Amino acid sequence: MSGLNIYFILQICSHTDTYFFIYSLSITLFFFSKYKMGVCISHEYSKPNAEQAEILQDFSKFMKPEERPPMAVEHQMYDYRLVEEEQDDELFAIVCCPHSIGYERDKIALVDLDPTSETFCTILSEVHLTSNGDEPGRMNWAKSAESLGEMNKFVRRNIIVPCMNSGKIYVIAFENEKLWIEKEIRNDELIRKDVSCPYAVRSLPLKGAPVHVSTLGDRFGNGKGDFILIDRRTWEVRKKSEPTFSDYGGDFSLQPRHNLMISSEWGHPRLLRDGFMPSELENVSESFGARLHVWQISPPKLIQSINLDTCDGSLVICVKFLHNADCNHAFAISAIGSSIFHLHMNTLTKEWAADRVAHVPLLKVENWQSDEMPALLTDMIISMDDRWLYVCGFLHGVLWRFDIQDPFRVSLHGKINLGGIFDSFPEVRIKTSNAMEDRWWLPPETRSLPRGTKFRGGPALMQLSKDGCRLYVCNSFYKAWDAQFYPELISDGGQMIRVDIVDDEMQLNEKFLIDMKGQPNGPFVIRDIKFLDGDCTSDSFL
């Protein structure tokens, strides 16, 4: 209890007037509640009402000056309008295109996003990887911008492509609309460091800082959450100096200003490659991870592990810090459990917590693989102004938009249907019992077709423009999952579509479609999108 609270208690004890006692007690409780927490207090307690304000004014003379205890920085959003004129709309994107069957090499392609161009929605150039079946994960640029204003002021020349199946890591060079392989890091280099299955890439905006790559397994393919570091000048691989690792690896996010990193847990790589088995889903605690890990970036050190409920938090597929480097808030989503978590730190105790702020319920269905269908959340994106959170449900075929201006009180703002099981398999129907539940979570009945073409599969991975007006969506996440739920993705290839945010609502752009069906040596699927001049996922601001 602070000195201020003790002071008011002494005031209470020194007065016998009942009326004064009641008012003094009210003040004591009010200030004790306001100062007992260390995280974003304004989001946990409402402003005083008129009566409380009057009490504060009447008894302000009794208030003893005291320093405010250390608080977490309030959630503040970027005002994108301040730098909007300095930013360019995305004209090109680099996309990852694995071969859907695997008898041809995967490729990385440059696509045209400029609606005024004659080559709009076509592949301008491409580079094939060196072997079949590499299965690229989440690629990223080797260089990060320090801030939003710096995005257009430096050249992005190299993109790092980790491959989950082959264990290779490719360094792809880009210049003058040409792509080529600058460096191939072979699997045996990772095996010697007792890691395998590289998945996600993040870069620091510091000069000379290495590229971080998360790995999902050990040398034998068992679950092991670790990281390797890649020198940006020589492309040499080294292991992090701290020997601690988690049970499982997964996605991760960097916050360099606070020297923090948060990583998630997936599961055993060998299980992920086989898709979802009923036996694994019945006992998720033995097959998948349900923890988030908070690390110190440099020198590397595990700070805290956060245990999530296994029903809600198993297989946390994605985790991201807010863009505003002053804030130490983050969000995460789980594939199994289809939940959204808000991560925040109490700056008095330095303890991190993960609150479940939203949950997409199971749908009761008939004529499907199971009687209940999860949403299977596969990706999320936070807008550059830290106001909106986009989450896609791979099976339900829905993209949700959440308002996160108050990260403690996340609210669902809108949704749009993009394919899904119900589009791919008309015989699958939602049982009428779902009508009694919250209809906000049911897939929308209205559907649109990009260029009159069916959107195969469901929304899997996304990218958002810096101004938050154009959301690009592709329909492949991992080929084992694609084949299990949407066989037509394997036979016909993947697609990339665009959702426009107009008047605060999401609308499918019916003129935009990149379809890999009919590609030479195909079919290919599309996943992971990176804009040349920066986007909402590539950079870790300082």
Swiss-Prot record:
GO terms for molecular function: selenium binding. It holds the Pfam family SBP56. Keywords: Selenium. It comes from the Eukaryota. InterPro entries: Se-bd (IPR008826). Belongs to the selenium-binding protein family. PANTHER family: METHANETHIOL OXIDASE, SELENIUM-BINDING PROTEIN-RELATED. This is Putative selenium-binding protein. The lineage of its organism: Eukaryota, Metazoa, Ecdysozoa, Nematoda, Chromadorea. The gene is semi-1.
